[in-house]
A protein has these predicted regions:
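N-terminal amphipathic/basic-hydrophobic helices that include classical n-h-c signal peptides
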Residues: 1-10
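Glycine/charged-rich beta-loop-alpha catalytic/anionic-binding loops adjacent to active sites
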Residues: 12, 39-42, 89-90, 113-123
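Glycine-rich phosphate/diphosphate-binding loop of Rossmann-like nucleotide-binding domains
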Residues: 12-50
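Short glycine/serine/threonine-rich phosphate/pyrophosphate-binding segments
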Residues: 23-27, 51-55, 74-83, 102-105, ...
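Acidic, glycine/proline-rich low-complexity segments that act as flexible tails and inter-domain linkers
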Residues: 25, 41-43, 53, 76, ...
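N-terminal beta-loop-helix "entrance" segment that forms/cooperates
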Residues: 43-64
């Protein structure tokens, strides 16, 4: 089975793979975060259960296509991250997707509980998960990219400034109650 899809390019740095197109609204947050830092990504829908051979081939060929890490999002019996990690030496970051009868707890545990030797870094359920997956990938890339590291430093500073403004606002409202 050939690993071919529109918009695949050797120039992409991060692979984003989701088990279903219904995951895209959540996973797009990872893509948007990467794009905001100027990191290019390829995006695919590949099912660990319905297209296992394609998942394995995708992972086996990822490094040769220039990818530096893979972000894998799946819900339910979320084996996508594990299948990809079993077939590559690239870092794999798993995003468990909430849904179904267990509201994502099954996906969280399936992504998190990998056997020794097949690591999948796992992020949170919900909207923080894809953002943190992208930021984790960016942090890995920034180890050898000073410009990207500077963007991360600016991002962290902006987060701190946002908290300081929120603190000042709440304190002003609290003072008015006294």
């Amino acid at each position: 089975m050939a690993v071919a899809a529109a918009k695949w390019s050797i120039m992409k740095t991060i692979g984003i793979v989701m088990g279903s197109d219904s995951d895209w609204p959540l996973v797009k947050k990872a893509y948007d975060t990467l794009s905001g830092f100027g990191v290019e990504a390829e995006v695919r829908v590949i099912s660990a259960h319905r297209t296992p051979d394609l998942a394995a081939e995708y992972a086996k060929t990822a490094k040769g296509r220039g990818l530096k890490a893979i972000i894998a999002a799946a819900g339910g019996a979320a084996h996508l991250g594990g299948i990809l990690a079993a077939n590559t030496t690239l870092p794999v970051i798993g995003i468990p997707v909430a849904g179904g009868a267990l509201n994502g707890v099954d996906a969280l545990l399936a992504t998190l509980q990998m056997p020794s030797g097949i690591p999948v870094a796992t992020v949170a359920l919900g909207s923080a998960g894809p953002v943190n997956a992208a930021l984790f990938a960016i942090q890995m890339l920034a180890l050898s990219d000073d410009a990207l590291a500077a963007k991360l430093d600016a991002h962290k500073k902006a987060l701190a400034e946002k908290v300081a403004k929120a603190d000042a606002k709440v304190n002003a409202e609290f003072a008015a109650l006294q």
